[in-house]
Amino acid sequence: MKNAGPSQRQLRVGEQVRHAVAYKLQQGILLDDLLKNIVISVAEVRMSPDLKIATCFVSSLSTLHNVSPTDVVNVLNKHSRFIRREISYSLRQMKYMPELRFRLDTSFDNFSKIDSLLRSPEVARDLHHNDEFKD
């Protein structure tokens, strides 16, 4: 049963860390100039089996067109120790405060690609062709 997916504890702790990180980022604790006018969304947090590493998948909505999501992730990784300390106050029940690693969340991009493929004329034609055989 190796690689059976994350345990229930990993999922529960990951959700607690996600809430804490999202709340602190919403408060605007980082005073970096690059993060002004940027909304950061924490989509998911995956915990390592020993609960010592938390990989946070984030996406950003920028009102400035010259800020790339990769730059936002780099800034978050630069300030990860500060964010870790800030969330430690709300996660006191944890024996070890996990190391935070920020990664770009590409799930929305993947969804957009799949959606555009499903809406393509070739797929629509095939779906319409399959409906004729059902009758």
Swiss-Prot record:
GO terms for molecular function: ribosomal small subunit binding. Coiled coil: none annotated. It comes from the Bacteria. The keyword Zinc-finger does not apply. GO terms for biological process: maturation of SSU-rRNA. Its main location: cytoplasm. GO terms for cellular component: cytosol. It is found in: Cytoplasm. Keywords: Cytoplasm, Ribosome biogenesis. PROSITE patterns: RBFA. Belongs to the RbfA family. One of several proteins that assist in the late maturation steps of the functional core of the 30S ribosomal subunit. Associates with free 30S ribosomal subunits (but not with 30S subunits that are part of 70S ribosomes or polysomes). Required for efficient processing of 16S rRNA. May interact with the 5'-terminal helix region of 16S rRNA. Monomer. Binds 30S ribosomal subunits, but not 50S ribosomal subunits or 70S ribosomes. NCBIfam families: PRK00521.2-5 (NF001802), rbfA (TIGR00082). This is Ribosome-binding factor A. It comes from Bartonella quintana (strain Toulouse) (Rochalimaea quintana). The gene is rbfA.
